[in-house]
Amino acid sequence: MENQKMPISSVPNLKDLNMISRPIANFPPSIWGDRFINYTCEDENDQTQKERQVEELKEQVRRELAATVDKPLQQLNIIDATQRLGIAYLFENEIEESLKHIYLHTYVENNCFEGSDDLYSVALWFRLLRQNGYKVSCDVFNKFRDNEGNFKNNLMEDAKGLLELYEATHVSIHGEEMLDDALEFTKTRLESVVSHLNYPLAEQVRHALYQPLHRGLPRLEAVYFFRIYEAHASHNKALLKLAKLDFNLLQSFHKKELSDIARWWKSLDFAAKFPFARDRLVEGYFWVLGVYFEPQYSLARKIIIKVFTMISTIDDIYDAYGTLDELKLFTKAMQRWDVGSLDQLPEYMKPCYKSILDVYNEIEEEMANQGSLFRMHYAKEVMKTIVEGYMDEAKWCHEKYVPTFQEYMSVALVTSGYTFLTTISYLGMGEIASKEAFDWLFSHPPVIEASESVGRLMDDMRSHKFEQERGHVASGIECYMKQYGVTEEEAHDEFRKRLVKAWKDINEECLRPYRVPKPLLTRILNLTRVIDVIYKNEDGYTHVKKAMKDNIASLLIDPVIV
C-alpha cells in the first residue's frame, strides 16, 4: 500500500508543511467492541458450591496418584491426563514427586516397568520425564529399531504408539538424530493412516499433526482434550469433572480480569487517539493467558497486559504512522524517561508517552510495596532497548536500505519483543523473580535468543507480504533472498530449519539442572508457544480471523458443559 497523506493537524509541531506522507497500514479495527467490558458475577452460592466440589475432587485425585506409586505406567497416564486437561497446576508437588520417583526407579536404577516393550508406554515415559526436565536418553527407543536402524515394520499398525512417539519427538535436543528420524517416520505414517482410524484416535492424530502438544497452549489444548478424553470409555470421571469445573471457575476469574482491563483501556481512548494503530486488547489478553493462566499470576497478568497494549501502540507509531523526525523525538524522550519530555513531542504522541509513564509508575508503586523496586530498572531498560530497535528499523525503511540477514537479525531479535515481554512477565511473579534471575535474563542466554528467533522468524514468514505491500522495512525473508540469491520458497525452507534448531535450543535449556527457577523458564517456553499458535498459518494478531476468534471464544466466552 502506498504512503498516504494525512492532515497536518495531527502533528501541530510541523506547521511549515501542508501535508505529510505517512506509511498508513489500514489495520482492521477491533472485532470485539465493548463485549468484554461488562462482567456479571456468578451467583455466590453457586460459586461456593463449585469451589467445594473442586476441593473434594482434588483430594480424590491425590489419593489416586498416591495409590499408583508402585504402578508407574498407571501413574504416567494419570499425570498425562492432568496435564492435557489443564489441571496439572493443582498437583504440582504431587506430579514432581511422582516423576522424580519414576525417574529414579526406572531410569537411574535401570529397572523395567510394566509396558516397557510397548511403544506407547515408552514414548509417554520419555516425553513426560523430558518435559519435567529429566535428561533421559532417547536410546530407550533402540528396541523399536531393526539392525539397520530403521523403525520396525510391526510398528506400522500401532497408531496409538506412533502418535505418542510423534509427540515425544518434539522434546528432542541437538544430536538426537534418532528422534529426527522418528519425527519423519511417524508423521509420514500417521498422515497415511489417519483417514482409516476411528474416533477419537483419528481426531487426536489430526490435531497433533496440526498442533503438536509440546508447542500448544496448555489451556487451549485442554479445551480440545475435554471431548477426546470423555470419548474414552475408561476415562477417569473424577478427573474430567474436576477439569471442567476448574476450567469454568478460572474462565470467570479471567473474564473479570479482562473486564477490569477493558474499562481501563477504554478510559485511555487509544482507539480514537491512535486510529492508525492495532486495537488488540482482547487478543493481547489471550496472548497473556498463554503465558500464564493460573490464578496465582493474576497480578503478573495485569502488569503485562497494560505494558503489552503500550508496546503494541508504540510499535505501530514507528511502523505505521510516525515520520523519521517525529520518531527521533520519541526515541529521545524514551531514553530520558521524564514527564518533562512531553513538551518536545508532536501532539499525537503525547497521550502514548504519558500513558507509558503512568503505567510504569503504577507498576513501580506495586514493586515498592513488595520490596522489589530493583525490578523497575530492568523493565525500563528493555523498553528503551526495544524502542531503539524500532528506530533502527524506521531508519532502514526511510532509506530503503536492505541490510544483510545477519545485520537484520541483530535488530529484529530485539524488536521481536520477546526479551521485552519475558522481562515484563517476571515483574509480578513474586520472590522467585530475583535480581539474579533478571541478570541471567539480561545476559541473553540461549533460551532467550531461541525464543526471539521463533518469534521473529514466524512473524516474518506470515506477515512479510502484507508488510511489503504497504512500504514496510525489509523483512528477514527479503534480506535473506537478497543476500543469498534464493527464491522466497527457499528462504522459507531455511527459516523452517532455523525454527527446528531454535526449538531444540529451548528444549535443551529446559533440562535440569535449571539455571533459574523452573516457573521462569516456563514463561519463556509459553511465550514461544503463543507465537507458534497465533502465527501458525497467518498473523492472527494483526488480522483476526476464524482461528483466532475461535481460540478467544474457547477461553473467554464459552464455558464447558460439566
Swiss-Prot record:
Its EC number is 4.2.3.-. Keywords: Lyase, Magnesium, Manganese, Metal-binding. InterPro entries: Isoprenoid_synthase_dom_sf, Terpene_cyclase-like_1_C, Terpene_cyclase_plant_C1, Terpene_synth_N, Terpene_synth_N_sf, Terpene_synthase-like, Terpene_synthase_metal-bd, Terpenoid_cyclase/PrenylTrfase. Mg(2+) 3 binds at E467. Binds 3 Mg(2+) or Mn(2+) ions per subunit. Mg(2+) 2 binds at D315, D319. It holds the Pfam family Terpene_synth_C. Sesquiterpene synthase. The oil-deficient phenotype of this species is not due to the absence of the genes encoding enzymes for santalene biosynthesis. This is Probable sesquiterpene synthase.
